[in-house]
UniProtKB/Swiss-Prot annotation:
The keyword GTP-binding does not apply. It comes from Cucumis melo (Muskmelon). Residues 34-110 form the Inhibitor I9 domain. This is Cucumisin. One of its GO terms (molecular function) is serine-type endopeptidase activity.
Amino acid sequence: MSSSLIFKLFFFSLFFSNRLASRLDSDDDGKNIYIVYMGRKLEDPDSAHLHHRAMLEQVVGSTFAPESVLHTYKRSFNGFAVKLTEEEAEKIASMEGVVSVFLNEMNELHTTRSWDFLGFPLTVPRRSQVESNIVVGVLDTGIWPESPSFDDEGFSPPPPKWKGTCETSNNFRCNRKIIGARSYHIGRPISPGDVNGPRDTNGHGTHTASTAAGGLVSQANLYGLGLGTARGGVPLARIAAYKVCWNDGCSDTDILAAYDDAIADGVDIISLSVGGANPRHYFVDAIAIGSFHAVERGILTSNSAGNGGPNFFTTASLSPWLLSVAASTMDRKFVTQVQIGNGQSFQGVSINTFDNQYYPLVSGRDIPNTGFDKSTSRFCTDKSVNPNLLKGKIVVCEASFGPHEFFKSLDGAAGVLMTSNTRDYADSYPLPSSVLDPNDLLATLRYIYSIRSPGATIFKSTTILNASAPVVVSFSSRGPNRATKDVIKPDISGPGVEILAAWPSVAPVGGIRRNTLFNIISGTSMSCPHITGIATYVKTYNPTWSPAAIKSALMTTASPMNARFNPQAEFAYGSGHVNPLKAVRPGLVYDANESDYVKFLCGQGYNTQAVRRITGDYSACTSGNTGRVWDLNYPSFGLSVSPSQTFNQYFNRTLTSVAPQASTYRAMISAPQGLTISVNPNVLSFNGLGDRKSFTLTVRGSIKGFVVSASLVWSDGVHYVRSPITITSLV
């Protein structure tokens, strides 16, 4: 498949699937914002805008307006954002030097105890000087520099390699902890309520940055909940904040601009708790493009898998060169007790910080608003309940909804009881609230109709032991991978449920202003910075490792998870639950570099011309460079087959020793009935650091279910280098 055909297929699918959304950027003349991606940066980056202008003049002629070029990408790769008609975009796509042209899309945010739960206590050994020279780039909603998590006491000046800058608008100041801050808002006005510059008034970016690299703050809590010492995975590391997300979302144009700067500024790792609603192919995906060029410069991107679960095919974090992170539970769970007037108590879930008080109790079905009946008001949907009849009462709603949904319609209520079959994570709400099991809510309704003056108390949340943890949470997006079905995604799982971290004092908590320094929220947005912090910690001990080597270390040392709790198996949790300390000394790694990804791209339909534009070198797709997906040196093994089809597939891999001493590893296979898995050779001897050995894994058999899991472990008796083998009929 040629690169131009790839463009045309994705151009039209993207255009029609996003026609309605793209109107947000559309002018009256039918022009929309497009990104023209042209691969590696020019040798003379300062000439990029002249080159781009010449291209546009060829297409639009005398009607060309310089202001239509919204942004030029030139520091780390080559491209521009521009307003075009559909016809103009097609013409540019066919021009020499263009890799892809795609509509600008809005991405979305994927929104303590966690580190101890991971076996990563405050007392772990650290290479303090190395950690202090590492810069974590966070692409998010900005940052709140006044948070105690970003105090720079004891920090030396920024490392000499740092080339970034600090925007100082709206009284924003960097320090020796936050050493860089930029903001991007290309091609559209600032939304009402947004603050120009890198200051975070949403909270999301402050929370993720402090989870990855925040300093130690004792007595951190949310109104008494989660009390303890807040800290990031690498508290001595520096932070560079790139604000790409605003009230209207996270634009492709802004994400690419941030990558362009972050790579050139000198960040060492990128944390990106953002993603698209729909999967896209690699070079019509801003995150895939940015992270590819980051890998070229030795920079790993940790990216949230998304919050679209629990169904299959919901993750949009698909690129093999980035680390896709699922969210899992930890052993602390917040619960909110409810006691009704007859003395019965029920355990619900929420983050409820409000004081305990007894209030009258009413069912939403009994107080329908004008124009509604009880069949609608029972669910408390928007404006369906009578505001005059709920004042000062706890309302029972036979549904559940997020912190910002419908609560304006419940203004004046004293509290809300909701219900859901899925209660594996807790939210904050603007009123005393608890989400009950459906049977407990039914018992509450029976009580209401058994007495003249029913009432209830919603107690402040407490914590209980969650013995089943870690389990991938229901909202975490799942694979398989829609772009390349035999590359397993997500890659790994980390804590993403009910995470306490820093928060701007001006940002809302549960939909209302609470003036707190910390907040408890859930999402793959929260698991992503945990993995960022751990990857950075691994890098402090192994500073010369490639992004792929760090990724391999995390994946092959991850703790296996139980498919009984997550029937989607590896498509829920990837290689398993992260194990920070084991990842520092994995023994062996599956390494990969740019040339490996070029071979992979050749196998995905990109031709020599396309890959040369992307890489800026003499890479080529040849008959001997087929780029079989099963030969990409990936730390997991994926195979998609037809149901009941007999298959016989082989995978080629190469392992690199990262231990100084000689060692011998033996292969151990775990496979269910119906699968025959062999490894040749099944014993590998390494002479020491950097020695490489290759092997072939062959899988034969047939499967009856949707997902069948097996595993390969290489062990020398000390290290256990584990890779999942996942066969699926979900094609």
